[in-house]
Each structure stands twice: as structure tokens, then as C-alpha cells.
């Protein structure tokens, strides 16, 4: 990890730059795959599965027999953990249900909103180096609460044509309707355009590598919406001299093991803590099963010493981290000053991994500085709010003249006339 001591504000932009994600260079490859999936459907998806995932498939859909077999293969202790996590995720997201209120803006004019679920959603669960069954819970649970009628899940199979049993178990528990053996760009294309097997959806959710990110960006231009721009995972720990260096190092490494392009940052007012964390990171790194991945990620990571907490907060809001852990003496007070972050973890006993799995909050969060404009996945991500209005004779007589004046000044005479004919019809 690179150490930076008392950086000038002019250095912040370069210092806080994320690892580059060059999706532009992938555009031709991604477009070719998407075009073939759009025109050839299942056949193209199956061919790309053989080329990219090295698996020969006869069909894409996961069968009931495979679901039953998977449930038997999940250890009891893992089932219990998944059930606990799903219960907490359900509780947190169910509390977000929208209750629209009718508002009378003036006598005779009543306006309100109604929350309606997106009917068809697609969830992408990456393969890669670890089975992300937790992401299944994070995406499918709020979709189920929202009332989405069709919840479609795509995830790449292994070379034997099987999906990790924990992914299938979590999907069934969280209410997924249909599961398909497809990964990468071809999976995004299948959900965006529809194939003989895979239904076309209206919105696609889920993380992925740079190819998946590029594919989601491309299909979002015309065909579907997506959850948010995605990039490599990241964490910032904001700490003072009271923080436990063992805890801080563990938190930094828990993010670093996600992938070689992940980023972990310590921002602290204590030089002593920075030195202790640097030592602890190296000590704990040697004990990790994924130490090679974490070690490469640490090359993108930084230990930053700042002069005071005001500077630390300003720097944090500029960085806008996906995950922010605050380990300071007055963490509640400092948390109130945070305006740009995906998810915030307060105090020494709130590790970021709690949010990744079982506290109940969602771990699908904005990265790459997008926390300045985006929030994480929530129940709102799976619904639309339709507005309604009802106007009586009293109401149109009150607001009608203002509408006529405004429409006339915008030179929209038909707009004006739509009100005028009603005012005259007494």
C-alpha cells in the first residue's frame, strides 16, 4: 500500500483516482456477442458458453431435479446462515415499502403516487473465483417484496454444466422464478433481448467484470434499464488514534480479496495508527487463502495521513466510497457529516463484511465515485411510482387561468385550449 503524508488538496484528484476500467476497448467484442444473441437466441448463448466458460450445454434452463439436488448438497450450517441473512435482508427492505398520500394542492385538485413493481427483472450473478450466493439474496429478496412477477437469474455454470448449489438454494429461498446457465455478455444479451428460453426483462441488476459492465451499458442505451454504473469494489476506513489497527487491517483486506482491481483506503489523523495498520496488513495478508488476489489489489490501495478530521471528512466526501467504515472516538458525529458514500459502517464492531452478508442492508452499491449521484439497490430499485391527479370543477377554475397564461407564453395554443374549452363548458 502506498503511504501518503499530508497531501495538498491539489493532489486529491490524482490520489483518489480508481483503477482504470476501459470498457471502450471492449465495445466491438461486446457488440458482436450481443448482436449474435439478439439474432440467434439460445444457439448463440450455448455457443458462447462453450467458447468462454468451456462448458457444452444441451439446454440453458435449470431443471427442478437440479434444484432438488442442490438443496441436498448445501451443508446445514450454510443453509442456516443463508436463512438468517435472508430474514434480515427481508426485514430491512420490507420497511422501505412506499405509502403514497393523497395531497390536495388547492381545493378541487388532488394528486398522489402509486408504487408499482417492475414486472420482469433480470439478475446477473457472476461466476469467477467464488460463488456469490449472497448477491442472489441482495437482489432477489427486494424484487420479491416489491412484487415483481418474473424474477430471472443468469449465472455461469462450471465446466460440468452445474451451478453452485448455494446459489440455487439462495435463489429458491428468495423467490427467483427462472434460472439459466449463462454468464458474461451472452447472459446480459439474453435477458435484454429474450431468447427461446430466456425471457426478455425490463431491468437488469448485478455485478460483473468489465465485459459484463460494458454489455450492461450497451443494452441500457435502447433495450432495458440497469441498476447503476458498476466498477471494481472499494472501501475506505476513516479512523483516528482510538481505532484498533487489527480491525482496520482486517477491513482493508476483506475488500482487497474481492479482486485484483479492488481498492482499499485508510484515511487517518494518526501517524501511529497508520504505521500499525501497515504492519498488520502484511501480517494478516500472509494468512489469507486468497492472498495473491489481495496482494495485487493492495497495489491500488493507499494509507493517507491528514492533518485533522475536517480534512478527513472533506477528502472522504470527494472520494465518495462504495463502503465507508468510521472508526473514530466520535463516529456518530462524524457520520452526520458524510454526504457521499454507498453504505456506512459505524464503530469498531461494524465490519463491512456484515453488510456484505447478514446485517440486512444491501451490498449492491455505487462504485467509482458514483455515490455522489447514486444510492445502492433498495426496494425502490424494483418499483415505479405512477402519479395520479383528479381535478374537479372548482379545481379547474382555480388553476385553469394560470395554465392558460403559461401555455400562451410558451406558444402552445393547444395546451391553452384544452383548459379553455373546459372553463367555458359550464
Q: What residue ranges belong to the model's regions?
A:
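C-terminal core of ALDH-fold dehydrogenases
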Residues: 318-426
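Conserved small-residue-rich beta-alpha loop and adjacent elements
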Residues: 103-169
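Flexible, glycine/charged-enriched surface loops at secondary-structure junctions
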Residues: 98-105, 225, 262-267, 287-297, ...
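Short acidic-hydrophobic, aromatic-tinged amphipathic segments that line or gate anion-handling sites
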Residues: 2-7, 178-183, 303-308
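N-terminal Rossmann-like NAD(P)+-binding subdomain of aldehyde/semialdehyde dehydrogenases
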Residues: 1-119
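A glycine- and small/hydrophobic-rich beta-loop-beta segment
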Residues: 258, 266-341
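Conserved NAD(P)+-binding/catalytic subdomain of aldehyde/semialdehyde dehydrogenases
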Residues: 175-263
Amino acid at each position: 500500500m502506498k503511504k501518503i503524508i499530508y497531501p495538498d488538496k491539489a493532489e486529491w484528484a490524482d490520489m483518489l483516482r480508481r483503477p482504470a476500467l476501459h470498457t471502450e476497448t471492449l465495445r466491438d467484442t461486446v457488440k458482436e456477442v450481443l448482436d449474435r444473441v439478439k439474432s440467434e437466441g439460445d444457439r448463440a448463448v450455448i455457443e458462447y458458453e462453450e467458447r468462454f466458460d468451456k462448458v457444452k450445454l444441451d439446454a440453458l434452463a435449470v431443471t427442478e431435479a437440479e434444484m432438488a439436488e442442490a438443496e441436498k448438497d448445501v451443508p446445514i450450517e450454510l443453509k442456516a446462515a443463508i436463512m438468517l441473512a435472508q430474514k434480515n435482508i427481508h426485514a430491512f427492505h420490507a420497511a422501505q415499502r412506499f405509502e403514497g398520500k393523497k395531497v390536495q394542492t388547492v381545493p378541487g385538485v388532488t394528486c398522489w403516487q402509486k408504487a408499482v413493481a417492475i414486472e420482469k427483472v433480470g439478475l446477473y450473478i457472476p461466476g469467477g473465483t467464488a460463488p456469490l450466493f449472497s448477491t442472489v439474496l441482495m437482489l432477489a429478496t427486494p424484487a420479491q417484496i416489491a412484487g415483481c412477477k418474473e424474477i430471472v437469474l443468469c449465472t455461469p455454470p462450471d465446466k460440468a454444466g452445474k451451478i453452485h448449489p448455494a446459489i440455487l438454494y439462495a435463489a429458491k429461498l428468495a423467490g427467483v422464478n427462472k434460472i439459466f446457465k449463462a454468464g458474461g455478455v451472452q447472459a446480459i444479451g439474453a435477458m435484454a433481448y429474450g431468447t427461446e428460453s430466456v425471457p426478455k426483462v425490463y431491468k437488469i441488476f448485478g455485478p460483473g467484470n468489465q465485459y459484463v459492465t460494458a454489455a450492461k451499458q450497451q443494452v441500457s442505451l435502447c433495450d432495458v434499464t440497469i441498476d447503476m454504473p458498476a466498477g471494481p469494489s472499494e472501501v475506505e476506513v476513516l479512523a483516528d488514534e482510538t481505532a484498533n489497527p487489527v480491525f482496520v487491517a482486517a477491513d482493508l483486506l476483506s475488500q482487497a480479496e474481492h479482486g485484483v482491481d479492488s481498492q482499499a483506503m485508510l484515511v487517518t489523523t494518526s501517524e501511529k495508527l497508520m504505521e500499525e495498520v501497515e504492519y498488520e496488513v502484511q501480517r494478516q495478508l500472509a494468512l489469507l487463502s486468497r492472498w495473491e488476489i489481495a496482494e495485487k489489489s493492495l497495489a491500488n490501495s493507499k494509507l493517507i495521513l491528514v492533518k485533522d478530521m475536517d480534512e478527513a471528512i472533506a477528502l472522504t466526501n470527494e472520494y465518495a466510497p462504495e463502503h465507508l467504515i468510521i472508526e473514530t472516538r466520535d463516529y456518530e458525529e462524524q457520520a452526520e457529516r458524510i454526504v457521499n458514500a454507498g453504505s456506512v459502517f459505524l464503530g469498531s464492531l461494524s465490519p463491512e463484511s456484515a453488510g456484505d452478508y447478514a446485517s440486512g442492508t444491501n451490498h449492491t452499491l455505487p462504485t467509482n465515485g458514483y455515490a455522489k449521484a447514486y444510492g445502492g439497490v433498495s426496494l425502490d430499485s424494483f418499483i415505479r411510482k405512477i402519479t395520479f391527479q383528479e381535478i374537479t370543477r372548482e379545481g379547474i377554475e382555480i388553476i385553469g387561468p394560470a395554465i392558460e397564461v403559461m401555455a400562451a407564453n410558451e406558444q402552445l395554443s393547444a395546451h391553452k385550449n384544452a383548459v379553455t374549452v373546459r372553463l367555458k363548458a359550464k
